[in-house]
Amino acid sequence: MAFDQDWVPKTRLGKLVVEGQVASMDEAIKSGLPIREPQIIDMLLPDLEDEVLDINMVQRMTDSGRRVKFRATVIVGNRNGYVGLGQAKDVQVGPAIRKAIDAAKLNITYIRRGCGSWECACGLPHTVPYEVTGKAGSVSVTLIPAPRGLGIAAGNTATKVLEKAGIKDVWTKTFGTTRSTLNFAKATYDALNQVNVVRLPVYYGKEEV
């Protein structure tokens, strides 16, 4: 993604990034400071990719009549653990997409990966480390560790979210109205976030001597 050379940071974290005191996303997250400027992500993750998942027209009745806006849902990620989901509305499609991209950047998080399938013992971070479930509205998505080489066994929307997070192999189980792209994407994103909720023992993944 292109970085805005004229950006003047307003937050403490933004100033630390420009000064070079925070040089990576890992350092930014560990600092405990909130990420409130999308330009921070542009600097720390220059290889970030974005993809529009859904554009929908929404209407609202007001005293002055019916108002129409476009709602855009966007996923961003570097295909190596960092992923974010965002949505925004605007009277035009272009601005709605740009706002959604900025929102996705501010929601970016690191997803822990591993080799959690009993059928595989490669030790590479190609799938989720254990089974997790995410929910959004009526949609429920369960991610199950898969052996290396299987690929992503999921619907189109979930596949886009998982690919941006760097997940290469995974089984999925879905329930509810998966035709709703927004809830399907949110449920998949929530499932990925559940990976970080579980606390693992310090010896997890280490061979016993």
From Swiss-Prot:
Q: Which domain of life is it from?
A: Archaea
Keyword Cell inner membrane attached: no
Ranges in coiled-coil conformation: none
User: What Pfam families does the annotation carry?
Assistant: Ribosomal_S5, Ribosomal_S5_C
Q: Name one GO cellular component term.
A: cytosolic small ribosomal subunit
What the entry lists under InterPro entries is as follows: Ribosomal_Su5_D2-typ_SF (IPR020568), Ribosomal_uS5 (IPR000851), Ribosomal_uS5_arc (IPR047866), Ribosomal_uS5_C (IPR005324), Ribosomal_uS5_euk/arc (IPR005711), Ribosomal_uS5_N (IPR013810), Ribosomal_uS5_N_CS (IPR018192), Ribsml_uS5_D2-typ_fold_subgr (IPR014721)
GO MF terms, alphabetically ordered = rRNA binding; structural constituent of ribosome
Please provide the record's keywords in A-Z order. Answer: Ribonucleoprotein, Ribosomal protein, RNA-binding, rRNA-binding
Which family is this sequence assigned to?
Answer: Belongs to the universal ribosomal protein uS5 family.
State what this protein does: With S4 and S12 plays an important role in translational accuracy.
**HAMAP family according to UniProt:** Ribosomal_uS5_A
Domain notes from UniProt = The N-terminal domain interacts with the head of the 30S subunit; the C-terminal domain interacts with the body and contacts protein S4. The interaction surface between S4 and S5 is involved in control of translational fidelity.
The UniProt subunit note reads as follows: Part of the 30S ribosomal subunit. Contacts protein S4.
Write the protein's name: Small ribosomal subunit protein uS5
Q: Which gene encodes it?
A: rps5
